[in-house]
Amino acid sequence: MTKEPVKGKGKTGNGNEQVLCSFCGRTTHEVNSMVAGPNAFICDRCIKTSYEILRKEISAINPSAKRAQESTFQTRLISPKAIMESLGQYVVGQEIAKKSLAVAVYNHYKRIDSQEWAHDSDEVVIEKSNILLIGPTGTGKTLLAQTLANLLDVPFTIADATSLTEAGYVGDDVETILARLLYASDFNLERTERGIIYVDEIDKIARKSANVSITRDVSGEGVQQALLKILEGSVVGVPPKGGRKHPEQQLININTRNILFICGGAFEGLDKLIARRVSKSSMGFGSKVKNKHTGYDPEILRFVTQDDLHEYGLIPEFIGRLPVISTLDPLDETALRSILVEPKNAIIKQYKKLFEMDGVELEFTDEALDKVVDIAIDRGTGARALRSVLESVMIDIMFELPTLKGVKKCVITADTIENRSEPEFYSGDGKKKKIA
């Protein structure tokens, strides 16, 4: 005999109507909360039970969902040497920056692990090692941060500092950054609180001078002040749907104590500040090492101090929250050529894979690769120019490729890169084909 479902309402001893859970029959006095639906109610206990049942079923079907629910501190701690080797598979050069990042990240997650068992009030408190990366556009700052997050299997998000403003002004507030990290972790709060946030263009929020201004600077010093709270570690109420469009929503509290922040920027002109300071004791220092394409002095940037950053426009409190400072070198012709072909996800390898899916072998002549590098250097945007140069050339070829009959090989020449001339096509027997 089928059991009758419990109704959503019942009668008390004195005849008054009361709310009952439609699943377990408990009254509002027996539970913490009751959620109402069309002609039905469900209590918080039944919601929790239902969630556990669904979680187990989903985990059995989808292993990645189970992994997402597991605590991230169980992830194997990777040594600095192993981190640096892994970074080297994707990032060409920048050995000093890779070593600094490897040590800082290793210490950061070692610090988190130690917090799980260190309860003695006399224990030494290890502070968080947020990182500041200084280097020209297109030198790999974002790629380094992204690769680290992938290697460690932690949530990752990128924020543009230029879009941030103080709360109450048009633009994104700093809580938006944490909301994006929450999305990246599929709303897994524990994974969110151990993720990595990369804040790009951090130099753009420097105030115009080191002197205190009486005018309101909502996208400069004001943003630095707002970022202090989440950089140093605090519990922040984050609106999951975005703060300003949905002010009525319930906040999710995120503790930023164990979130690693990596800030990056070009800091154009910083080398001149350093040179001016250094030249007082060493005349002509660094004058022979300027990069001819970027104007950057890579050697002198390594001597950057907190005072230099303060003079540039970062407030002392903000600088203090970024104890690890590393610089990246401008990319020369050799480095750009290596970036094209050597990393695991090199752009040339990606194009070859795409052509392979169409049954066509793709080849670039050495002269073609040199021409790509020359054009990229002229544009002055580092490695990111490589893709844009190639994309502008390859788009027409990839548009026609699926409909070309009998083509088994495509050779990109220097003339193809420079003048958009037709590449060399070959049939399966090695004969050159002319495509009308």
UniProtKB/Swiss-Prot annotation:
Originating gene: clpX
Keyword Ion transport: no
SUPFAM superfamilies membership: Glucocorticoid receptor-like (DNA-binding domain), P-loop containing nucleoside triphosphate hydrolases
Role this protein plays: ATP-dependent specificity component of the Clp protease. It directs the protease to specific substrates. Can perform chaperone functions in the absence of ClpP.
Binding site for ATP: 136-143
Entry keyword annotation includes 4Fe-4S: no
InterPro entries cross-referenced by the UniProt entry: AAA+_ATPase, ATP-dep_Clp_protease_ClpX, ATPase_AAA_core, Clp_ATPase_C, Clp_protease_ATP-bd_su_ClpX, ClpX_bact, P-loop_NTPase, Znf_CppX_C4
Any one GO MF annotation of this record: ATP hydrolysis activity
Organism: Chlorobium phaeobacteroides (strain DSM 266 / SMG 266 / 2430)
Protein name: ATP-dependent Clp protease ATP-binding subunit ClpX
Domain ClpX-type ZB: 9-62
Gene Ontology CC terms: HslUV protease complex
Homology family: Belongs to the ClpX chaperone family.
Superkingdom in the source lineage: Bacteria
Record keywords, A-Z: ATP-binding, Chaperone, Metal-binding, Nucleotide-binding, Zinc
Assembly and binders: Component of the ClpX-ClpP complex. Forms a hexameric ring that, in the presence of ATP, binds to fourteen ClpP subunits assembled into a disk-like structure with a central cavity, resembling the structure of eukaryotic proteasomes.
GO BP term (any one): cell division
Pfam families: AAA_2, ClpB_D2-small, zf-C4_ClpX
Binding positions (Zn(2+)): 21, 24, 43, 46
